[in-house]
Amino acid sequence: MALLQIAEPGLTAAPHQHRLAVGIDLGTTNSLVAAVRSGVANTLADESAQHSLPSVVRYTQDSVFVGREAEAFSAQDPQNTIISVKRFMGRSLDDIQSGSQTFPYIFEASDNGLPIFITPQGKVNPIQVSADILKPLVERAESTLGGTLEGVVITVPAYFDDAQRQGTKEAAALVGVKVLRLLNEPTAAAIAYGLDSGQEGVIAVYDLGGGTFDISILRLNKGVFEVLATGGDSALGGDDFDHMLQAHFQQQWSLDEVSAGLSRMLLIEARKVKEALTDSDNTTANVTDDNGNVLSLNVSRATFDEMISKLVKKTVSSCRRALRDAGVSTDEVIETVMVGGSTRVPLVRGEVANFFGKTPLTSIDPDRVVAIGAAIQADILVGNKPDSDLLLLDVIPLSLGIETMGGLVEKVVARNTTIPVARAQEFTTFKDGQTAMAFHVVQGERELVADCRSLARFTLNGIPPLAAGAAHIRVTFQVDADGLLSVTAMEKSTGVKTTIQVKPSFGLSDAEIGSMLKDSMANAKEDISRRMLAEKQVEAARVLESLSAALNKDGQLLAANELSAIQGAMALLAQLAEEKDTDAIEDAIEALDTATQDFAAKRMDNSIKLALKGQSVDNI
């Protein structure tokens, strides 16, 4: 399926040049930018061949330093070196300060209670800090790709709320780039592995980064990623593994008190040991202490595994809770995706494999997998992948509607409507006392349901039992930027409602869309005739239904010859309604209307008499 180049059948959409777009993983610890080049998605390196950019910003009186330059001063100038700003996004200062963690920054609350950092550069908020991280990534991309970006896809945690997502968009706006889409990080990882095309089922995304652990349980159904549950620990990550090794070194070397410089050296060596034990069973730690003594220690993978075992088991417990929250079992999980550098640790991979009962996906660099998925999405959104199996629409390719009586289609959202979009229409009941209404959502340009594509069916229960036509049901079609359709039906007086979600683009190729459009044009005249016939048949059924109810209630008001005339006209209408002569049905409806005019007048007189019965002139 292709990103739609909308054109009428028989015409060709204008070709376009390759458009520049990238995916950005705006991470808590590190950030990356990726792009699709020559059909392959990969992260982009800076001038020093470094792919990751530490998410660290240092503010001095004269300059703003980002990445490794800023990180180098994190111990010397912690007050003005902001790390993990992602944790501050969309949160109030009260919320931040009420937590157990203390921060070296000088804070001030904004007018709406959000945190502001006081720096030598003045006051900056988390959005501005995030923008300062985004800026070098955008510059790197434009320099590497050789042009101006048309847009970016930025990844965010699945649990980010609207305020946090909006803050991320505003950070991009400060840099001057267009956000094509905010993409959930676990969804990006799944896209990188191609899990969005073809497969259906439950996917677990295990994300163990430097400072945080996240587990996301996704359900993939007909092209739609639904987040079933999320969990994790915002204070557990690979950094904790490093600190455990650091403590082990200090204990083995009897270092009771260490300087800030030695402490940092121990931590750096701990990270090297952790990385070495990923591929080796043993390695040696070497550190020079404050007195110039060279300290050495052999560390085995078994020793390291024993140290971190409790922490790894803690992540598995989070996985168990997330599955329970999602209401699924490990047997239902078809794939487990590993994200984050700390998932390289063999014990982590082993425990995850044991828990889910299958080998996790690790072929893509876990540090880069989210950015790569975002790049694939960005490339599609700007129209660079005409053969993509992902159909991500910026317009509605075929009209969306609902079935009405007689098998007719009431179009709610017309084709070529730009998305996101919301449209609503009101419907009513057909019969007296009707307490439920079945809805059939369809797609296509034809006038009858039988000629359109069925998308979904659902039922609204709890409608008040009123006379036919008295209940008002508002049906809202909402299509988001990802082409996901939500249809909500709500009875207005009670507020009772039901909702269903569907992806209209799933399983639909450009060729099929073109064929459906051509069919609608070729059959337009016949379809209109069939629709007019169906409408008259529905009108006839409605007239006969309401008249039968009226005769059952007030038939005694008629003389025998009057009743016979009406029944004869009703029988004729019922007979013609089964045939295919629209004009004859319309004539029969008019004839029945003429035959019942005296009956309608008698019913009105009788109703007035009953209403006035027992009333005096003075009370009227």
From Swiss-Prot:
Superkingdom of source: Bacteria
Keyword Amino-acid biosynthesis: no
Entry-linked InterPro entries: ATPase_NBD, Heat_shock_70_CS, HSP70_C_sf, HSP70_peptide-bd_sf, Hsp_70_fam, ISC_FeS_clus_asmbl_HscA
Keyword list, A-Z: ATP-binding, Chaperone, Nucleotide-binding
Gene Ontology MF terms in the entry: ATP binding; ATP hydrolysis activity; ATP-dependent protein folding chaperone; unfolded protein binding
Signal peptide as annotated in the record: none
GO aspect biological process, one term: iron-sulfur cluster assembly
Family according to the record: Belongs to the heat shock protein 70 family.
UniProt function note: Chaperone involved in the maturation of iron-sulfur cluster-containing proteins. Has a low intrinsic ATPase activity which is markedly stimulated by HscB.
The name this protein goes by in its record: Chaperone protein HscA homolog
